[in-house]
Amino acid sequence: MGRCGRSNDGVIGGVRPYVRSPVPRLRWTPELHRSFVHAVDLLGGQYKATPKLVLKIMDVKGLTISHVKSHLQMYRGSRITLLGKPEESSSPSSRRRRRQDNEEDHLHDNLSVHARNDCLLGFHSFNFREQTSATDNDDDDFLNIMNMERTKTFAGNGESIKFQSHHSLEAENTKNIWKNTWRENEHEEEEELSLSLSLNHPHNHQQRWKSNASSSLSETSEAVSSSSGPFIFRDCFASSKIDLNLNLSFSLLHS
């Protein structure tokens, strides 16, 4: 069995007694903690930072390496607790502070997640709307082109129909003009022939000239009625005019 009691060096039960230092213990103020966190972040995080380097970066008078070491261990433990591991036994104020920090971190994470989701949703919806509008514009452009082509086709057909109708109308007007001109010329020739016969010749010759003129005119009328064009009308009229002139000159010589 082991020995119990006081040893020669004053150690009770083999455990070294706690000796309180006459110097007051250093208190970690918020400013000192912010300086500590800044030093840890500069060193690349809580697992890459060492107490010696943190102490050197902080450069605070009265701060020892043991203070930094204990605070770094507590800081690592608090970070582990925030990640979901069992919470170490500490004071109520520390637990309340860590709970507040946890709630703030959780709220920040949720806001970050929602912001990222909103950004992603906005990005995808923007791309989708942009692609949809581009497709609709392409469809609208295609439909507009088709409508323009159809309008041009209808307009071309309308112009051709209008041109054809206008051309046929001009041809009909020309034909009517030729008919009216031929009828007027025929009427004038009849009047001139009747007047010349009545003034220059006796009554019997006048009757004969009238009969010859009427027969020639009847033949001319038959020729004109059998023809079907303004140019044929003019040719028939010209030939009948020549016959009438020949008959008239022959009769005058005999008289």
Curated annotation (Swiss-Prot):
GO terms for molecular function: DNA binding; DNA-binding transcription factor activity. Residues 51-76 bind DNA. GO terms for cellular component: nucleus. Residues 20-80 form the HTH myb-type domain. InterPro entries: Homeodomain-like_sf (IPR009057), Myb_dom (IPR017930), Myb_dom_plants (IPR006447), PHR1-like (IPR046955), SANT/Myb (IPR001005). GO terms for biological process: regulation of DNA-templated transcription. Signal peptide: none annotated. It comes from the Eukaryota. It is found in: Nucleus. The keyword DNA-binding applies. The keyword Lipid metabolism does not apply. Keywords: Activator, DNA-binding, Nucleus, Transcription, Transcription regulation. Residues 80-110 are annotated as: Disordered. Putative transcription factor. This is Putative Myb family transcription factor At1g14600. It comes from Arabidopsis thaliana (Mouse-ear cress). The lineage of its organism: Eukaryota, Viridiplantae, Streptophyta, Embryophyta, Tracheophyta.
